[in-house]
């Protein structure tokens, strides 16, 4: 199930390389139209477009294709939930189930709905092991003491923000929080922090 950005392309390439049969559902106004062309190039079982509110249609497409495991790849702008989404009955029931409208609650409710229809929602990084950062220092230069202090401070702040389910990204400098992710997404908070 594809949102925006390069992540869906990476997942598609990796899953195909591993020999998986794929049915791709692109979210209209989110997923890149090039994803349909790439899917055709890989001779996938099928490619379908749904609007953000068509969870029932998405489930119908997947169950008809015999899908028992699905993953979501790519961002879906949360602001879209508050403007112009026309939810189908399945989406309405799913939104009603979510106690809040933050990311964790929404994804959990969607996962539960998929599960009720025999579709397990799997980790979006399942096929991307070689592309994920390994634990530890990623540069050839050791961190300074000030950078280590910022890193520890940043970890504690990010952990606190994540517990509140506000976002997953923060930027810090000299033990001050410069920017916190909210609904605008990771890329936007990084760009904003760079401007500050």
For each feature predicted by the language model, list its residue ranges:
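N-terminal basic/disordered segments at the start of proteins
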Residues: 1-27, 53
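Short glycine-rich anion-binding loops that position phosphate/pyrophosphate groups of nucleotides
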Residues: 4, 75-78, 176
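Short beta-strand segments
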Residues: 1, 25-26, 70-74, 172-173
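Conserved mixed alpha/beta catalytic, RNA-binding, or beta-rich assembly cores of soluble enzyme
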Residues: 15, 120, 124-196
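N-terminal glycine-rich phosphate/adenylate-binding segment common to multiple enzyme folds
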Residues: 55-128
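Short coil/turn connectors at secondary-structure junctions
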Residues: 18-21, 44, 65-68, 116-119, ...
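N-terminal beta-loop-helix "entrance" segment that forms/cooperates
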Residues: 26-51
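Short amphipathic alpha-helices and their capping/turn segments at secondary-structure boundaries
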Residues: 12, 58-68, 190-196
